Design a protein with these regions (language model features):
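N-terminal catalytic or cofactor-binding beta/alpha core of small enzyme domains
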Residues: 1-102, 107-183
Length: 183
Protein backbone atom coordinates (compact mmCIF):
# COMPACT_ATOMS: atom_id res chain seq x y z
CA UNK A 1 0.00 0.00 0.00
CA UNK A 2 1.74 3.17 -1.14
CA UNK A 3 1.33 6.58 0.46
CA UNK A 4 -0.70 7.68 -2.55
CA UNK A 5 -3.10 4.72 -2.35
CA UNK A 6 -5.02 4.93 0.91
CA UNK A 7 -7.49 2.28 1.91
CA UNK A 8 -10.85 4.05 2.12
CA UNK A 9 -13.38 2.61 4.52
CA UNK A 10 -16.82 4.10 3.86
CA UNK A 11 -18.63 4.50 7.12
CA UNK A 12 -22.19 5.43 7.94
CA UNK A 13 -24.96 4.57 10.35
CA UNK A 14 -26.45 2.33 7.62
CA UNK A 15 -23.23 0.32 7.27
CA UNK A 16 -23.01 -0.09 11.03
CA UNK A 17 -26.54 -1.45 11.19
CA UNK A 18 -26.39 -3.72 8.17
CA UNK A 19 -22.82 -4.49 7.14
CA UNK A 20 -20.73 -3.19 10.01
CA UNK A 21 -18.90 -6.39 10.86
CA UNK A 22 -17.82 -7.06 7.28
CA UNK A 23 -16.56 -3.47 7.10
CA UNK A 24 -14.60 -3.92 10.34
CA UNK A 25 -13.22 -7.19 8.97
CA UNK A 26 -12.11 -5.38 5.81
CA UNK A 27 -10.28 -2.78 7.90
CA UNK A 28 -8.67 -5.52 10.04
CA UNK A 29 -7.43 -7.31 6.90
CA UNK A 30 -5.99 -4.07 5.55
CA UNK A 31 -4.26 -3.26 8.85
CA UNK A 32 -2.83 -6.77 9.20
CA UNK A 33 -1.50 -6.56 5.65
CA UNK A 34 0.13 -3.25 6.52
CA UNK A 35 1.67 -4.76 9.68
CA UNK A 36 3.01 -7.77 7.71
CA UNK A 37 4.62 -5.54 5.10
CA UNK A 38 5.95 -2.76 7.33
CA UNK A 39 5.94 -4.04 10.92
CA UNK A 40 3.51 -3.88 13.82
CA UNK A 41 3.19 -0.46 15.47
CA UNK A 42 5.22 -0.01 18.64
CA UNK A 43 3.31 3.10 19.70
CA UNK A 44 0.03 4.85 18.99
CA UNK A 45 -0.24 8.64 18.80
CA UNK A 46 -3.84 9.86 18.91
CA UNK A 47 -4.04 13.54 18.10
CA UNK A 48 -6.89 15.85 19.07
CA UNK A 49 -8.70 17.38 22.00
CA UNK A 50 -11.83 16.67 23.97
CA UNK A 51 -12.60 20.41 23.92
CA UNK A 52 -13.83 20.17 20.34
CA UNK A 53 -16.38 17.56 19.32
CA UNK A 54 -14.92 16.99 15.87
CA UNK A 55 -11.34 16.90 17.11
CA UNK A 56 -12.07 14.31 19.82
CA UNK A 57 -11.68 11.33 17.46
CA UNK A 58 -8.02 10.73 18.32
CA UNK A 59 -8.39 10.95 22.11
CA UNK A 60 -11.47 8.70 22.02
CA UNK A 61 -9.50 6.05 20.11
CA UNK A 62 -6.51 6.47 22.43
CA UNK A 63 -8.66 6.00 25.53
CA UNK A 64 -10.29 2.87 24.14
CA UNK A 65 -7.04 1.30 22.90
CA UNK A 66 -5.23 2.09 26.16
CA UNK A 67 -7.84 -0.11 27.88
CA UNK A 68 -7.95 -2.87 25.24
CA UNK A 69 -4.21 -3.11 24.51
CA UNK A 70 -2.34 -2.15 27.69
CA UNK A 71 0.99 -3.40 26.27
CA UNK A 72 0.90 -0.80 23.47
CA UNK A 73 2.37 2.63 24.24
CA UNK A 74 -0.52 5.08 23.73
CA UNK A 75 -0.16 8.84 23.72
CA UNK A 76 -3.28 10.97 23.35
CA UNK A 77 -6.30 10.07 25.46
CA UNK A 78 -9.27 11.96 26.87
CA UNK A 79 -7.41 12.42 30.17
CA UNK A 80 -4.10 13.32 28.52
CA UNK A 81 -4.76 14.66 25.01
CA UNK A 82 -2.05 15.43 22.49
CA UNK A 83 -2.93 18.44 20.36
CA UNK A 84 -1.38 21.37 18.49
CA UNK A 85 -0.75 23.24 21.74
CA UNK A 86 1.31 20.50 23.41
CA UNK A 87 2.57 18.34 20.54
CA UNK A 88 6.11 19.75 20.61
CA UNK A 89 6.29 19.19 24.40
CA UNK A 90 5.13 15.60 23.98
CA UNK A 91 7.76 14.99 21.31
CA UNK A 92 10.40 16.54 23.58
CA UNK A 93 9.28 14.36 26.53
CA UNK A 94 9.35 11.19 24.39
CA UNK A 95 12.42 11.68 22.18
CA UNK A 96 12.44 8.04 21.07
CA UNK A 97 8.83 8.25 19.84
CA UNK A 98 9.79 9.19 16.29
CA UNK A 99 12.22 6.25 16.17
CA UNK A 100 9.45 3.75 16.90
CA UNK A 101 7.03 2.34 14.35
CA UNK A 102 4.35 4.87 15.09
CA UNK A 103 0.70 4.74 14.09
CA UNK A 104 -0.94 8.18 14.21
CA UNK A 105 -4.71 8.70 14.43
CA UNK A 106 -6.45 12.02 13.83
CA UNK A 107 -9.71 13.57 12.69
CA UNK A 108 -9.81 15.37 9.37
CA UNK A 109 -12.08 17.66 7.41
CA UNK A 110 -12.87 16.93 3.78
CA UNK A 111 -15.47 16.92 1.05
CA UNK A 112 -19.12 16.30 1.84
CA UNK A 113 -19.12 12.88 0.12
CA UNK A 114 -16.13 11.81 2.27
CA UNK A 115 -17.64 12.62 5.67
CA UNK A 116 -17.63 9.38 7.63
CA UNK A 117 -14.76 7.90 5.62
CA UNK A 118 -11.67 6.45 7.25
CA UNK A 119 -8.34 6.49 5.45
CA UNK A 120 -5.63 3.99 6.33
CA UNK A 121 -2.33 5.09 4.84
CA UNK A 122 1.33 4.25 4.83
CA UNK A 123 3.42 7.34 5.55
CA UNK A 124 3.32 10.20 8.02
CA UNK A 125 0.26 12.09 9.20
CA UNK A 126 0.29 15.84 8.74
CA UNK A 127 -1.62 16.95 11.84
CA UNK A 128 -3.38 20.30 11.81
CA UNK A 129 -3.50 20.64 8.04
CA UNK A 130 -7.31 20.76 8.10
CA UNK A 131 -7.18 23.92 10.21
CA UNK A 132 -4.14 25.40 8.45
CA UNK A 133 -1.60 24.63 11.20
CA UNK A 134 2.03 23.86 10.40
CA UNK A 135 2.98 20.88 12.58
CA UNK A 136 5.64 18.24 12.02
CA UNK A 137 4.61 15.13 10.06
CA UNK A 138 4.37 12.08 12.33
CA UNK A 139 4.07 8.34 12.04
CA UNK A 140 5.06 5.48 9.81
CA UNK A 141 1.40 4.94 9.02
CA UNK A 142 -1.78 6.73 9.96
CA UNK A 143 -5.54 6.58 10.15
CA UNK A 144 -7.66 9.65 9.59
CA UNK A 145 -11.40 9.94 9.94
CA UNK A 146 -13.21 12.61 7.95
CA UNK A 147 -15.62 13.96 10.55
CA UNK A 148 -17.00 16.99 8.71
CA UNK A 149 -16.72 19.28 5.69
CA UNK A 150 -13.65 21.49 5.39
CA UNK A 151 -12.79 24.61 3.46
CA UNK A 152 -14.48 27.36 5.45
CA UNK A 153 -14.49 28.29 9.15
CA UNK A 154 -12.73 25.06 10.11
CA UNK A 155 -12.66 25.66 13.88
CA UNK A 156 -16.38 26.40 13.91
CA UNK A 157 -17.04 23.28 11.83
CA UNK A 158 -15.03 21.09 14.24
CA UNK A 159 -16.93 22.56 17.21
CA UNK A 160 -20.24 21.75 15.51
CA UNK A 161 -19.52 18.20 14.41
CA UNK A 162 -21.96 15.47 15.43
CA UNK A 163 -20.68 13.67 18.52
CA UNK A 164 -22.53 10.48 17.52
CA UNK A 165 -20.56 10.21 14.28
CA UNK A 166 -17.23 10.86 16.02
CA UNK A 167 -17.96 8.26 18.70
CA UNK A 168 -19.08 5.65 16.16
CA UNK A 169 -15.96 6.24 14.08
CA UNK A 170 -13.76 6.01 17.19
CA UNK A 171 -15.43 2.75 18.17
CA UNK A 172 -14.93 1.36 14.65
CA UNK A 173 -11.23 2.34 14.58
CA UNK A 174 -10.70 0.90 18.07
CA UNK A 175 -12.36 -2.40 17.16
CA UNK A 176 -10.31 -2.73 13.98
CA UNK A 177 -7.04 -1.80 15.70
CA UNK A 178 -7.59 -4.13 18.65
CA UNK A 179 -8.49 -7.03 16.35
CA UNK A 180 -5.55 -6.38 14.02
CA UNK A 181 -3.02 -6.17 16.87
CA UNK A 182 -4.26 -9.15 18.87
CA UNK A 183 -2.76 -12.49 17.84
Amino acid sequence: MADTEPMKVPFSDHRIATKGQSTVDEAVRTLRSLWRQHGVPEALLCIGTDRSTGDALGPLVGTEIETQLPRLKVLGTLNHPVHAGNLEDVLRNYPDLTQKRLLAVDASLGRLQDVGTLLIRLGPLRPGSGVNKQLPPLGHYHITGTVNVGGFMEYFVLQNTRLALVMQMASFISLALAASLNP
